[in-house]
């Protein structure tokens, strides 16, 4: 493939970093002043556009889907996180969402741009094991699931920091109900009436985190299954207890426990939010920790000799 100037790809990432760096304090200012977040959404949307352009140019330059090393996967994760944030804000354009979610996209692109050595930022030919159509199916789905789970977990963290003295009363009937929950009351004529009660800030965040984590969990399941099929084709085994595989399974179990406590135990508010925050830590270990150790078949490699 024809080579692009390397600073063009990294420059787009740096531009996205600057936009998100500007958006973050504006988001926190909007929270404190209860201002609208239109400018923050615009900055995040522009950052997502730059990240999209960066990934497309990297794809054109390298000749393969740009998710083959730690730098590319971090840029892809930043893109997925900003996109998830924009989609969540369409459901509830609150400055709290922007303040909770923007740090994740900013952290990913900052780590990719400033923490990785130049060798890891360079495009390189795919190793034979990655020259498969499963690369897009498995890795991209896993990364998008991480983005949804990370954003959802950050919203759960926001639940822990808001409405701390108020009992949350979110019910399944309020999921996707436009910020209202349904409640029965007895009217003056003695007839039961259905009334809509606006959700509190904590309940809105709880609803959004639940929905976002549910989507992320389903995608993580698809990603793990597709990875097992690909592993069998490439290495002759569906599961080898590679460190990344093991931590991905732990991640799946944590979020399965989160959904179980909500669906079967009726937990809501702060208790499942604590489980989601544990999931946040597990994803960090699974994604970054394994690469820092530089071990396993799934490691992108941190040490280069």
Swiss-Prot record:
GO terms for cellular component: plasma membrane-derived thylakoid membrane. Keywords: Cytochrome c-type biogenesis, Membrane, Thylakoid, Transmembrane, Transmembrane helix. Its main location: membrane. The chain crosses the membrane at residues 11-31, 37-57, 63-83, 96-116, 141-161, 212-232, 246-263, 275-295. Required during biogenesis of c-type cytochromes (cytochrome c6 and cytochrome f) at the step of heme attachment. May interact with ccs1. This is Cytochrome c biogenesis protein CcsA. It comes from Parasynechococcus marenigrum (strain WH8102). The gene is ccsA.
């Amino acid at each position: 493939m024809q080579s692009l100037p390397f600073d063009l790809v990294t420059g787009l990432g740096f531009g996205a970093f600057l936009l998100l760096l500007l958006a973050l304090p504006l988001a926190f200012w909007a929270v404190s002043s209860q201002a609208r977040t239109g400018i923050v959404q615009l900055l995040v949307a522009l950052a997502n556009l730059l990240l999209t352009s960066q990934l497309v140019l990297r794809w054109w330059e390298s000749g393969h889907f740009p998710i083959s090393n730690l730098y590319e996967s971090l840029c892809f994760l930043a893109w997925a996180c900003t996109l998830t944030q924009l989609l969540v804000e369409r459901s509830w354009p609150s400055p709290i969402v922007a303040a909770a979610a923007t740090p994740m996209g900013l952290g990913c692109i900052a780590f990719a741009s400033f923490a990785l050595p130049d060798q890891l930022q360079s495009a390189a030919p795919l190793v034979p094991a990655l020259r498969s159509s499963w690369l897009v199916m498995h890795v991209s789905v896993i990364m998008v699931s991480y983005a949804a789970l990370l954003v959802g977990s950050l919203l759960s963290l926001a639940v822990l920091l808001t409405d701390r003295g108020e009992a949350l009363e979110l019910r399944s009937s309020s999921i996707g109900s436009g910020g209202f929950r349904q409640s029965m009351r007895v009217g003056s004529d003695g007839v039961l009436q259905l009334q809509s009660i606006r959700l509190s800030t904590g309940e809105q965040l709880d609803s959004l985190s639940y929905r976002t984590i549910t989507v992320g969990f389903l995608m993580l399941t698809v990603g793990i299954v597709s990875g097992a099929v690909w592993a069998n084709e490439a290495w002759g085994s569906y599961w080898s207890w590679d460190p990344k595989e093991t931590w991905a399974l732990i991640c799946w179990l944590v979020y399965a426990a989160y959904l179980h406590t909500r669906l079967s135990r009726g937990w809501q508010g702060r208790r499942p939010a604590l489980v989601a925050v544990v999931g946040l830590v597990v994803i960090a270990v699974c994604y970054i920790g394994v690469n820092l150790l530089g071990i396993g078949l799934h490691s992108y490699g941190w040490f280069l000799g």
